Amino acid sequence: MAKTILCHCEDIEIDELYSALEQGYGDLETLKRYTGIGTGKCQGKCCIVQTLRLLASLQTSHTRESMMGDPDLIHLPTIRPPVLPMRIDDIADMEEDTP
Amino acid sequence: MTKTADIVVIGGGVNGLSCAYNLAKRGVKNIVVLEKGYIGVGSTGRCGAGVRQQWGLEENIILARESVKIFENLSGELGFNTFFRQGGYLILITDEHEHEIVAGTLPLQNRLGVPTRLLDTKEIAELVPGLNLDGVIAAAFCPTDGFCYPYAVLWGYAEAARRRGVTIEVNTEVINVEARADGTYTVSTGTTAYQTPVVVNMAGAKTKDIAAYLGITIPTQPFRHEIAVTEPLKPFLDPMVISLKKGFYFSQSIRGEIVGGIGDEHEPSSYQTGSSPEFLLRYAKAIRDTFPALGKARIIRQWAGLYDVSPDARPILGGVDGKPGYFHACGFSGHGFMLSPVVARLMSELITTGCTSIPIDGLNLARFDGGPVTKDPYVVG
Ligand SMILES: Cc1cc2nc3c(=O)[nH]c(=O)nc-3n(C[C@H](O)[C@H](O)[C@H](O)COP(=O)(O)OP(=O)(O)OC[C@H]3O[C@@H](n4cnc5c(N)ncnc54)[C@H](O)[C@@H]3O)c2cc1C
């Protein structure tokens, strides 16, 4: 069967998302940490919106109710710096007092 | 809506969930855990999940040692891989004063069964090739220290607690707790009032706010601590490397990322958990100084969480005189993950039997009423 990759950085297939949902890991914050989606080099720029789209289209019966909560809980996770991966050397060489 | 419970646990962090699990294991039936967000949204989900037994005070060493024993079998017990890896903690020593403190406590640690030993620079270089040893005079190394993946521990406890009948309500914030005339409590969320004889307050840095509903004053303060992670690298680093003096720590996760942080003595007390570029700069300098080759590694993400700091940097555990059925565990001061297995065991003993197999009287809230308290010299950041 063809595989559908959801998160390219971490090589996560769509089936892994479904399996996590079936085990009750239903909200995005938890899915991110359970499957690894969005935690790779691009930090979710490619996969998080796809994951959200899938979550929004799925029947809530897929998930344990207590984890799913209400649809308002489907939101983007906090975007953490740095925006792009940065070398420790490059950071350490930055000037302390740049505004 | 009104519901009843035998025990209401407030907080779905590692302490609340492990306590609920231990209570269920001891036969308590109707346990409800109330968590305002998702599991792990508090400090636990943001922490380094390091587990060490190298402490200066006897009580701290014993608690940490007992926790490690539980961590060693926790994956099997919970039926969930916690990714506990015992690569040891390597405490770098950079001056004579620090040497005196660390070397001075080794006999105590060893007597209590914690196998810490002092390494000279040659042994350090063998253990962690690539460390910059300029200015390092020795290191303390305990091979049975280690770390976990914090979410795995949380989910493991949550699953095991649910299997034993515990109800875990997420996205459910406690907005009031009231003592009733009959000696029980009402714990209110927006939609439900739980009537219960026992309230277990383990709301992390918010524990003191919950306690305040009952007129209990807890002298803890929240402080932001920042942390960062690199892209995954080939496994090369076994121990967690830390400096008590410089306040940094870093280790390599099972996924290969370097996870670490550094404290900031100027950080004011607040509930803010935003990320700062100043931290990144300080951390990058400290890491490059300590392990120059890591300069080539790229940081992909930084975040922050709260330390709930008590006046002596030691946890506050137990009940409160005049409030039967009320219990709390807080003030972990940055060490609440490593202590959670033993804290859960002892708190569940206290709640169900009134006594504990390891004395924790010295950690009760009332200790702050009296004279000065003793701080452990092994506090980082
Ligand atoms: C950057 C960082 C690194 C750390 N590294 C380590 C380490 O290496 N080793 C170690 O041992 N410790 C470490 N710590 C400390 C550790 O994270 C904490 O001590 C520990 O996780 C505390 O667990 P807890 O369950 O008591 O609290 P929390 O995990 O904070 O859980 C409390 C829960 O209560 C919930 N809550 C709060 N108010 C309410 C309310 N009104 N109603 C319902 N729920 C509520 C919160 O949402 C939260 O989920 C670190 C902390 C940080 C920030």
Question: Which residues make up each language-model segment?
Answer:
Chain B
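Helical element adjacent to the flavin cofactor pocket in flavoenzyme catalytic cores
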Residues: C142-P197
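Active-site lid/adjacent beta-loop-alpha segment flanking the redox-cofactor pocket in flavoenzymes
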Residues: P232-G325
